[in-house]
Amino acid sequence: MPVVLAEFIDYSLEWLRCESLPFPVLNFDVWNNIRGSNLHLGPCFDQTVPGQKLTLPFLKRFTESSGIADGFDCGTLVQRRQLNNTLNDSSCQDLAAKTGEILGMIKRTLARTRSCSHASIEWSPIVEKACLDFFSPGNLQRFLLLFWSGWYPNSPIIHKPTFNSEAEPPGLIASMAVLGACLSPDSNDCVRAMAWLTPVEEVVFADNILYDDSIIASSNLVGDEAVVWDKLKALHAAYFICIAQNWEGSKEGRQRVRKDRYSRIVSIARSFGLYNLSLAKLDTTFSTQQKWARFILLESMIRTATYIYLLDSAFVLYYRLPPRVISLELNTGLVCPEVCFQAESAAECFLQLHMATMGKQNQSSLTVSSAVRLLCSPHNLDLSIFHNLSSFNMFTIISALCCLVFQYQTTLVDVSQVTPAATGLSRWKWLWQRGGHIVVDSDGYSVENMWKRVGFMQHANEYYHLACAMLERWKLTEKQIGDTLAAWAAPVGSVQGNPKYDDGEMVQVKALIHDMENMTY
């Protein structure tokens, strides 16, 4: 391990020695003794049980896995095999027209972009047959089922109860199918999916509606604006193919997603107006089909904006890429409870919405940026406004706090200036422990209901530990900080082993997680 990195990790692990299990908190004496700091906090958990180790099962698996199925919560191999027993022959035939649409779309796009294509595919009768075979009606049904049951809980941005695969754009169906195929228990499906990652990527990013800046979303939409829906679905297609390409594609494909394609997605979402949406003005007192349509559109856009931010924050934390979405520009409202978004009817949805918002009027006005600001505030705060936030919302907030810590690492800040992050982390942990959040294994769900489970967001507490370990670097004295910053400022490639940016192999975060898990305290 590089010398400088080892020194960082040694210091960053000091906090573990004074932690409680299973919910560590910061060693607040560090912050209370900072000269000029107004932060005065105290630990609110019991002391450490000697000899125990911190475990970070999700982060360890995520950083060491080689693909989506192994790295994320996508159900067990047995569950994904059982999905084949739920296939319906009549549904297969209904998707025959979609197979033809996907074939025509890919063929036209590759012919049009042949001179500048990344796909390296020369269209021929053999390629056409392979395309028809991979996107056949039967395969589409299987792959979409794998998408819903395996991947969907990790990014529930589409309203499944009203989703109609026969009526959806071919680009979206192709993107979802490729991602679903990557989760197939049949290795042949996975291998064939690799061949179609880049062609589908080119198809969805060639959709002109993505770049139409005249289409702008707002909280005043009524829910039936076709052109807004079309752009949102095109954005979903681009998002899903980026997920598949980044975790299953070639080295070139992964780099293209992280450096180019995802920057486009962020820019498109920004010009689309997705970072300023909220359900605060939605009347939940009684249900109508029109209000349900409005809810579905607005909540889908809010979730899309949030997940675009979450993937960007993952690129920041794991690959040390500069952030493209700033936490404080994310003025989207917090997402609604999953039972509301999963409801099968307007009546059920609005009943759940009414119950969720009853007595929590102020919570509906929270945005991601305001939540982070409040938690990091030096002033006394009534935390009841955050009462019973979902794992989804808590994960979004801890991701923002992690990115805040990362930004400290890349600037020459004085140690007294990092107290907002320490405050935010301590308050977040207090809320998490009192929110009744537990990790639920996918085995507890029937095959038919796997799409309703909570995805990787339920492991948000592991991100808290990671943020604390990173933040402890500022526990050093003024002189030690100066020495550390001098080492970080060494020229790229120097023998000191300075931190690497655009770390495609996640070397540094893997090393940090390894050392955290192997320290006994």
Predicted segments with their positions:
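Short HxH-centered metal-ligating active-site micro-motif
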Residues: 226-238
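Carboxylate/His-rich catalytic cores and anion/metal-binding grooves
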Residues: 180, 184-204
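Long amphipathic alpha-helical scaffold regions
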Residues: 217-220, 229
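Structural signature of alpha-solenoid helical repeat junctions
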Residues: 168, 172, 233-236, 300, ...
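C-terminal substrate/ligand-recognition segments
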Residues: 454-479
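Intrinsically disordered, low-complexity activation-like regions
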Residues: 1-168, 175, 179, 199, ...
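Specific register positions within alpha-helical solenoid repeats of the TPR/Sel1-like families, i.e.
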Residues: 181, 185, 246, 402, ...
